[in-house]
Amino acid sequence: MKLRTKAKALRGRLRVPGDKSISHRAVIFGAIAEGQTVIHGLLRGQDVLATIQAFRDLGVTIYEAADSLIIEGRGFKGLKPAQKPLDMGNSGTSMRLLAGLLAAQDFSVQLLGDDSLSRRPMDRITIPLSLMGAELSGQGEKELPPLIVKGCQELRPIHYQLPVASAQVKSAILLAALQTQGETVILEKELTRNHTEEMIEQFGGKLSIAGKQISIKGPQRLQGQILQIPGDISSAAFWLAAGLIVPGSDLVLENVGINPTRTGLLEVIEKMGGQLSYQAVDKDIQSASLRVSYSSLKGVEISGDLIPRLIDELPVIALLATQAQGTTYIRNAQELRVKETDRIQAVTDVLGQMGADIQATEDGMVIRGKTPLHGAAVSTCGDHRIGMMTAIAALLVEEGQVTLERAEAILTSYPDFFKDLERLWHD
């Protein structure tokens, strides 16, 4: 598709879709809790829809109400064997978390994914789950999908140190541990998003957290809840970037989640000199309205324990860096290479073709700014975040046309992205 270029200014107020990470977990915990769960603000992107369909296939009643999703929870022991493989689509979160949950069930199931998901390593979950006594098998050394999860009613607790900073791996272990007799202890390499831990407590479960160590005793029973999901900071990130780099822009993003494990982007914006302010802070659901306006930015270094707190925002941070004076260094971000695509290479290719001075490294990128961007024919590589980054980059293009192949990938997390762009466009 052809992308809009030559933006004069983006102005207005916008409410971004519900948080994708929290939406997945809300559906999962609603299904395994006892009683009814009502979810407001759920993201209805393709990834979350895959999770919903998986639980329907496992016998859970899920239906739409006027402004909510209602789940009639069946408890851990109420899931039924699926009559067909569970299709996770493009969703690594769905596959990894469901593998942990289903590892303790008394039936077997096959988890499938699309071409992109079928290239993503699952050994990072099969190893700890196997230590718990689960039987899982994928393809090759990295246990690539399809993934077969064989039923195992009696898992054993483990003490496990995560070799990578991954909330998905942590969550898979926690979902298995909730069904396991005894105490499981997880030691994180770096602190990662804590939505699973928060949701366990929200549904009436118990666990203890001391620094990077999480301890949980099972088995536990969970109770259905009424949930309000804030807007996704990872989706808001693209509009925050647009507001900062498109001259004349002034945007307010309403009801954005500001869980501290996810706000690394906001710290980077402030470090780069961006004009950012918080409004209407709601501490109960950890949300706020964020206002940004066009700013003169400067290059920064991004590395270390900050990386897990902005891992999904690094593509759009790289775009910000192309419009910042000086050099930006992104380090310790090798996890980007095993996302929906190799995001280090994809970001470097797309922005490089558009004229950016950007270089890929083994674990990150080096970006020198400020550089003008020009038209190019590029692809999302099937990655929604690459697609949205490109659409924001195109706004700065004064010469040439930007064409984007496989733009449908954006439906994964933000079905109304281009509609929202039109709402903010000012000639």
Curated annotation (Swiss-Prot):
PANTHER family: AROM/DEHYDROQUINATE SYNTHASE (PTHR21090), PENTAFUNCTIONAL AROM POLYPEPTIDE (PTHR21090:SF5). SUPFAM superfamilies: EPT/RTPC-like. Monomer. Keywords: Amino-acid biosynthesis, Aromatic amino acid biosynthesis, Cytoplasm, Transferase. This is 3-phosphoshikimate 1-carboxyvinyltransferase. 3-phosphoshikimate binds at K20, S21, R25, S166, Q168, D312, K339. Phosphoenolpyruvate binds at K20, G92, R120, Q168, R343, R385. It comes from the Bacteria. It comes from Streptococcus equi subsp. zooepidemicus (strain H70). HAMAP family: EPSP_synth. It holds the Pfam family EPSP_synthase. It catalyses: 3-phosphoshikimate + phosphoenolpyruvate = 5-O-(1-carboxyvinyl)-3-phosphoshikimate + phosphate. Catalyzes the transfer of the enolpyruvyl moiety of phosphoenolpyruvate (PEP) to the 5-hydroxyl of shikimate-3-phosphate (S3P) to produce enolpyruvyl shikimate-3-phosphate and inorganic phosphate. Pathway: Metabolic intermediate biosynthesis; chorismate biosynthesis; chorismate from D-erythrose 4-phosphate and phosphoenolpyruvate: step 6/7. GO terms for cellular component: cytoplasm. Its EC number is 2.5.1.19. GO terms for biological process: amino acid biosynthetic process; aromatic amino acid family biosynthetic process; chorismate biosynthetic process. GO terms for molecular function: 3-phosphoshikimate 1-carboxyvinyltransferase activity. Belongs to the EPSP synthase family. The active site is at D312. InterPro entries: Enolpyruvate_Tfrase_dom, Enolpyruvate_Tfrase_sf, EPSP_synthase, EPSP_synthase_CS, RNA3'P_cycl/enolpyr_Trfase_a/b. It is found in: Cytoplasm.
